[in-house]
Amino acid sequence: MPNTLDLSGFAITLVERGLQGLPVAEQVDAFCRDVTQAGFRARRFNMSIGTLHPRHGAHSYVWRRDEGLATELHPRRPEGVSEGYLKSPIYRLRNTDEVTLRRRLDAGGPVDFPILEDLREAGMTDYAARLVSFGEAQQRDPTKLFDPKRSRPD
């Protein structure tokens, strides 16, 4: 497996599928299959998109290598966001200047997010997260969408 997670070569295909109007679920499933066929040993992939729906705050697409794709709707909560979200890597990325986060899970040391302990217990060895804004594909070269050296999305 490559030591660095370079997904830039997949960005153009991802954007092209989006421009073809393929449903998001099909795009996510195809992306995950492409990545694993290219040699990345991905076991789980999650993409969440915030919504403007009055009852649903977000829509998640969760792909697991052994199970395929599932979708989840996250209801808006009168009390605000869930405790799990507040303790998640994505919450951290959305509320700091960071754009990427990567953690080795096989090092045996403590982890800084509860989800990472769950993933470690499931046998996963690496975790990577990346914020991508909708405007990036239109404003920049699509091959740069997954560049870990990029600055925070606009």
Q: What are these model-derived regions, one by one?
A:
Residues 20-68:
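Helix-loop-beta substructure at the N-terminus of cytosolic sensory domains
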Residues 126-154:
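Sensory-domain boundary capping and coupling elements
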